[in-house]
UniProtKB/Swiss-Prot annotation:
Homomultimer. It is found in: Virion; Host cytoplasm. The keyword Lyase does not apply. It comes from Infectious hematopoietic necrosis virus (strain WRAC). Belongs to the novirhabdovirus matrix protein family. Keywords: Host cytoplasm, Viral matrix protein, Virion. This is Matrix protein. The keyword Ribosomal protein does not apply. The M protein has a crucial role in virus assembly and interacts with the RNP complex as well as with the viral membrane. One of its GO terms (cellular component) is host cell cytoplasm. GO terms for molecular function: structural constituent of virion.
């Protein structure tokens, strides 16, 4: 009889929506910092999603990055449920309300065929949209991990529910239309007098 006890190995069965060939890999996105909204404060869920989309696109360079949805979900959750602090910035010419959301070790996950191992140092990202300036000051950590670790499957299910929700779909369509309009915008041509 051995005096050493062998630890039991837990075999995790991935849920059906993960069985796409890359179920063994998942990337964790950890964020830490604060979101400042100067100007128009987001009050509805749709506004919070829209602000989050703009901020996520500014950070990862567009909505095609694999972590765009995950980052949008993360920021939206912090705006919806995180701790908030409001004040008026009297240092500017036009005193504008300033809302701060604390992002303390928030985590989301997303699937990727080739997981990144990337740590981004503390940086400031800022974007202006519809009467407000949204600024995130903080750091990110993208790290690969097994799909069963740290309750990632529950988080993926939450992300899946968020991206299929009616609110997200409405804002996504509006955001896509607005982005397309911004990309196709052309300056009006100057026309001379016709003889």
């Amino acid at each position: 009889m051995s005096i050493f006890k062998r630890a039991k190995k837990t075999v995790l069965i991935p849920p059906p929506h993960l069985l796409s060939g890359d179920e063994e890999r998942v990337t964790i996105l950890s964020a830490e910092g604060e979101i400042k909204v100067t100007g128009r404060r987001p009050t509805t869920l749709e506004e919070k999603i829209y602000y989050s989309m703009n901020l996520a696109a500014a950070i990862v360079g567009g909505d095609l990055h694999p972590s765009f949805k995950s980052m949008t979900y993360l920021f939206q959750k912090e705006m919806e449920f995180g701790s908030t602090q409001e004040k008026v910035n009297f240092g500017s010419r036009k005193p504008a309300p300033q809302t701060t959301y604390q992002v303390t070790k928030a985590r989301e996950v997303y699937l990727q065929t080739q997981p990144l191992e990337k740590k981004i140092p503390m940086q400031t990202y800022s974007v202006s949209t519809e009467g407000a300036t949204i600024t995130f000051t903080g750091r990110f950590l993208f790290s690969s991990s097994h799909v069963g670790c740290d309750d990632n499957r529950t988080k993926l299910a939450g992300l899946d529910g968020f991206t299929t929700s009616n609110s997200y779909q409405r804002v996504k369509d509006y955001y896509a239309q607005e982005t397309a309009l911004a990309l196709t915008f052309a300056a009006p041509e100057k026309r001379g007098k016709e003889k």
